[in-house]
Design a protein with these regions (language model features):
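Short amphipathic helix-loop junctions that connect adjacent transmembrane helices
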Residues: 1-8, 186-203
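C-terminal ends and interior cores of transmembrane alpha-helices
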Residues: 44-57
Length: 208
């Protein structure tokens, strides 16, 4: 246990958002790698970062593992939407994106349920939980890479940064959504642990 205070939590989240702020650099990576390959590599980074977190219970160690997993997470999030839209036609995209969001929510419920059961009933250690989570991510990434090494695209891929004034509302909502996520999932969680003594299983049950 690293025994973080609010100051360390703030620094940790600042480090976590550095790759998010620099996610636009994905357009330069795509000049070298195919988008699908980039997505697989990003997921591998995410899995490795999660897997090693439990074995680095220090301030510097958690900063390092958080940065690694954040690089994977933010780059994957950057290309995920693009890959999803390339698979579908314009007519079927809204319904299919809704199904993808539903699948993502279902996966979150499975993960939170696993945390709750692992801490309350199984008694797994932090390092074991992180190792299991990271290993599952790596195994699924390897499976997807072997099962789908290359797939076609219904929509031509653009490899340049695109910003348009008429999308300002979308940009604003995305910005506010990020702010909400920081407040709700980061500092609210820290408050529940620090001030109200919530355990890991309590936080997991709350998210469920």
């Amino acid at each position: 246990k690293a025994a973080f205070t609010g100051a360390e939590i703030g620094m940790l989240q600042s480090i976590r958002e550095i790759p998010g702020f620099l996610a636009f650099t994905a357009v330069f990576v795509l000049l070298i790698l195919k988008e699908q390959t980039f997505a697989y590599l990003s997921l591998a980074f995410l899995g490795v970062g999660v897997a090693i977190t439990g074995y680095l219970p220090s301030v510097i160690g958690l900063y390092f593992s958080t940065f690694i997993m954040s690089v994977g997470f933010h780059y994957y999030e950057t290309v995920k939407q693009s890959l999803s839209l390339q698979w579908f036609s314009i007519d079927e995209a809204p319904a299919m994106l809704g199904k993808l969001i539903a699948a993502s929510s279902a996966a979150s419920l499975v993960a939170y349920s696993f945390l709750w059961l692992a801490m309350d009933y199984v008694g797994l250690s932090y390092s074991a939980i992180y190792l299991v989570g990271g290993s599952v991510c790596l195994c699924l990434t390897l499976f997807m890479w072997l099962a789908f090494p290359r797939f076609g695209s219904n929509t031509p891929q653009r490899k340049h940064l695109l910003m348009r004034k008429r999308y300002w509302l979308y940009y604003a909502l995305t910005f506010m959504g990020g702010a909400r996520r920081q407040i709700f999932t980061v500092f609210a969680g820290f408050l529940m642990v620090e001030k109200f003594g919530y355990s890991v299983s309590d936080i997991a049950a709350l998210f469920i």
